[in-house]
Amino acid sequence: MSYERVTPRARQGTTGICVEMDVTAGNGVWIQPPDRVAAVTIAVHIPSGQTGSFTIETSCNRPETLGENATGGYWDNVYGDGVTLNENTVVMIANAVTGIRVNCISGAINVAFCG
């Protein structure tokens, strides 16, 4: 799977985050929540008339371990091992993690990170 990073950790500061990206099957998007953001809301939407399946994962490894492409470290599915979602989903995660990533398994999705 290929991941695109939507925002670097050091560039957001106290202004918060609000970014989104369209993601297609076999790709993903990830973020390192800024230190001063208390929580991040992840909203995943499947475009009207389309289908899509995806996972949402978090990691607590050091940013250096995660790397620039989010393929390092250990990642945990927030809904449990092997759980794949296939409907619009919104979840809030406290900023006690170093990385959040969304994997598009099939179809197409829109992913937004706000905090």
Residue ranges of model-derived segments:
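Short, surface-exposed beta-strand/strand-loop-strand elements in extracellular ectodomains
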Residues: 49-70, 111-115
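Surface-exposed loop/edge segments in extracytoplasmic proteins
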Residues: 15-19, 63-78
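Solvent-exposed strand-to-loop "edge" motifs in beta-rich extracellular domains
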Residues: 45-49, 105
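Compositionally biased regions
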Residues: 3, 56-59, 99, 107
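Short, intrinsically disordered N-terminal pre-domain segments
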Residues: 1-18, 108-115
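Structural beta-strand segments of beta-rich domains
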Residues: 38-42
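Generic low-complexity segments that are intrinsically disordered, proline-rich and/or Lys/Arg-biased
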Residues: 9, 34-35, 48, 64
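Beta-sandwich interaction modules
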Residues: 22, 26-37, 73-115
